[in-house]
Amino acid sequence: MLNLKKYNQKIKHLLIFSFIYIFSFYSHTNSFPNNLNVPIGFEITIFADELNSPRQITETENGYVIVGSKKGDKIFALYDGDLDGYAEKKILIADGLQNPTGVSFYQGDLYFAEIDTIWVVKNIDDWLDKGSQTLPTKTVFMNDLPSETWHGFKYIDFGPDGNLYIPVGVPCNICLEPQTKDNRFAAIHKYEDGELITVADGVRNSVGFDWHPITKKMYFSDNGRDWLGDDSPSCELNVVDKEGSFFGYPFKHAKNVIDPEFGSMIPTVNKEFIDPIAELGPHVAPLGIAFYDNDVFPKKYKNSIFIALHGSWNRTKKSGYTVVFVKLDDDGNYLYQEDFITGWLSN
């Protein structure tokens, strides 16, 4: 966790996400890995441990941190009641679920996503504050999402427009057929008035997105395809300037990598290809991203992005395993990127 008395919720979420994920197998009494490197003035401590592959997190108005799970079947709330930086309470909210990865808190209610179903628990803070021994009532918000598990984890969040945003990854490394049969694949959608509307198309597998605090434009990460060598293609950071824009998959990757299987079809694709605003590196697997819009950090961090890089799994020399900072200018254009937290590979 970021050890500051005051911090922006979303950046806290990003950092807790990274650290909880890494330290799932550490107990509170174990020594903290001492090889993590952060900029001067920042400090990392363990906020929670002994969790089963936690992924997306969200925070309620009353300060409960809700945690989804990639491999487990439960949703938990974490609570640091004494404000010492460690969550002494872990409260079960739901169980018996299929990979309930995505969680989002909106207008008092908790939303969480399985592979093909999104649930809602109304007035979650009221239930948590009461300390009930009975699980809260959950109701189906929607239950007809694609059920494929390969790139099927659903990361969710509400946008500035009040709609729920849902990415649907492709059930493959590189393919075209699934999208031709079901256009929900390879895209990010918003759920508006009972239907899914495509916000970004040609997206292989996005598991992180956020909105610029000033422009309100949506920025999202995308995981690049595998098996084109150690150094190609790069994973991406994209911005949606126009709803429904096409970002290249499966025909083109990063800024200039033509796919060897589908690239020859580009002349037949009647769409404008949008390049990423930044290449994050090959096989780094970007996960959560978050804008920082508070005034506690040094000025350079404001209205720019932090991205958690899961790290490579099939590269000769490992890459990623960091949190990076992506600096944007006042108009939201990319300037540069730099490491913010490193050292996990040495642990």
Tell me what each language-model feature is.
Residues 78-84, 121-132, 242-246, 325-332:
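Short loop/turn segments immediately following beta-strands, especially the blade-tip
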Residues 69-70, 115-117, 123, 169-171, ...:
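Short loop/turn segments immediately following the C-termini of beta-strands
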Residues 30-38, 153, 170-175, 183-186, ...:
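Beta-propeller domain segments
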Residues 66-86:
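Beta-propeller domains
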Residues 44-48, 89-94, 139-145, 195-200, ...:
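A short beta-strand motif characteristic of beta-propeller blades
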Residues 66-68, 112, 165-167, 219-222, ...:
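Residue position within the beta-strands of beta-propeller blades
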Residues 116-158:
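Asp-box/WD-like beta-propeller blade repeats and closely related beta-sheet repeat scaffolds
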Residues 50-62, 95-113, 147-164, 201-216, ...:
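Beta-rich, blade/repeat-based domains predominating
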